[in-house]
Regions:
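Acidic/hydrophobic-patterned starts of short beta strands in beta-sheet-rich repeat architectures
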Residues: 62-67, 127-137
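Short consensus segments that form the blades of beta-propeller domains
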Residues: 73-82, 110-111, 140-145
Length: 210
């Protein structure tokens, strides 16, 4: 599922997920359901959610994915309003939340991390009945170094807890530098279908920011 604020796109993607029996809803602060989730479950992370995703997974339960931003007061050299990122996936349990995995990255020096919401997705690429969560973000910077574009993949793969894998594309700033990609050892062990999906997200996100 690709998360966009365009209602027709969101509706279509949700109906596709329903057909696959993994039912996913995507909510922003202007949505009534967003407010209902906050009232019922609260906000378990620092900052404010820019997006909340709920996925009901048959035989596993209901998962809630928060993607939060927090404006920082400490000084950085970054032009604009620096923000820290806090994200987490939680399992609903009798009106409460059980943490499954969390993420955070902080603004510092000349840069700050920035969610690429249009490229954060939930999907079941390997069709094993449990979705993968694809968190995509960019290391925006006023510096001259190459800037990281990252896709973090959260999978379960028969385990009790979610695990993290990552692929990074380094976006060159200077003409003499070249674009390159690197992935961690965990990413290399993912099923081919999941790797290909993450690589496509990275490719599409790269086009989207250039």
């Amino acid at each position: 599922m690709i998360f966009r604020k365009l209602l027709p796109v969101v509706t279509f993607m949700i109906s596709m997920s329903s057909f696959a029996q993994i039912r996913t809803g995507v909510y922003f602060s202007s949505d009534k359901k967003y407010k209902e989730i906050i009232e019922e479950l609260g906000n378990p992370l620092e900052g404010n959610p820019v997006m909340i995703v709920k996925s009901f997974v048959p035989n596993h339960g209901s998962y809630v994915w928060y993607l939060n931003e927090k404006k920082i007061e400490k000084g950085t050299y970054f032009e604009g309003i620096p923000k820290d990122l806090y994200s987490g996936i939680f399992l609903e349990d009798h009106g409460g939340l059980i943490p499954q995995i969390t993420f955070k990255d902080f603004a510092k020096d000349l840069g700050q991390p920035m969610y690429l919401i249009n490229y954060c997705e939930v999907g079941d690429a390997d069709k094993d009945g449990f979705p993968e969560f694809y968190l995509t973000y960019f290391g925006e910077s006023d510096g001259l170094d190459a800037k990281p574009l990252k896709v973090i993949v959260y999978t379960k793969r028969g385990q009790k807890t979610l695990s993290k894998s990552k692929i990074t594309g380094w976006i060159p700033y200077q003409e003499e530098d070249k674009y390159r990609e690197e992935s961690d050892a965990s990413f290399k062990l993912l099923p081919k279908a999941i790797r290909l999906k993450a690589e496509k997200i990275l490719k599409d996100a790269k086009k989207g920011i250039q």
